[in-house]
């Protein structure tokens, strides 16, 4: 017997991915890993919206997925620009606690 994926299974997967991303943001101090964890959290939220839209036969879940996808792209671009600026400023570390020293 083959089990077919259901929206409930997708919601459980989204909750697990979100928890994993949240754990990564709270535990890691490296900005690159924090950005990757935020991306995991955004993808989990997008999966939850698609699963909810599938469950209730609504197209809003897919619309929200596209909105989250564009938000994730903007977040990645801004985050990587900040990381590049920190590297150009001569900071050898990507520790989140040194980010308050950015100027200009």
UniProtKB/Swiss-Prot annotation:
Gene3D superfamilies: 1.10.287.3510
Compartments where located: Cell inner membrane
Highest taxon of the lineage: Bacteria
InterPro entries (UniProt xref): NADH_UbQ_OxRdtase_chain4L/K, NUOK/Mnh_C1-like
Keywords: Cell inner membrane, Cell membrane, Membrane, NAD, Quinone, Translocase, Transmembrane, Transmembrane helix, Transport, Ubiquinone
Role according to the record: NDH-1 shuttles electrons from NADH, via FMN and iron-sulfur (Fe-S) centers, to quinones in the respiratory chain. The immediate electron acceptor for the enzyme in this species is believed to be ubiquinone. Couples the redox reaction to proton translocation (for every two electrons transferred, four hydrogen ions are translocated across the cytoplasmic membrane), and thus conserves the redox energy in a proton gradient.
Family of the protein in this entry: Belongs to the complex I subunit 4L family.
HAMAP family in alphabetical order: NDH1_NuoK
Subunit description: NDH-1 is composed of 14 different subunits. Subunits NuoA, H, J, K, L, M, N constitute the membrane sector of the complex.
Record's protein name: NADH-quinone oxidoreductase subunit K
The species this protein was found in: Gluconacetobacter diazotrophicus (strain ATCC 49037 / DSM 5601 / CCUG 37298 / CIP 103539 / LMG 7603 / PAl5)
Lineage: Bacteria, Pseudomonadati, Pseudomonadota, Alphaproteobacteria, Acetobacterales
Gene: nuoK
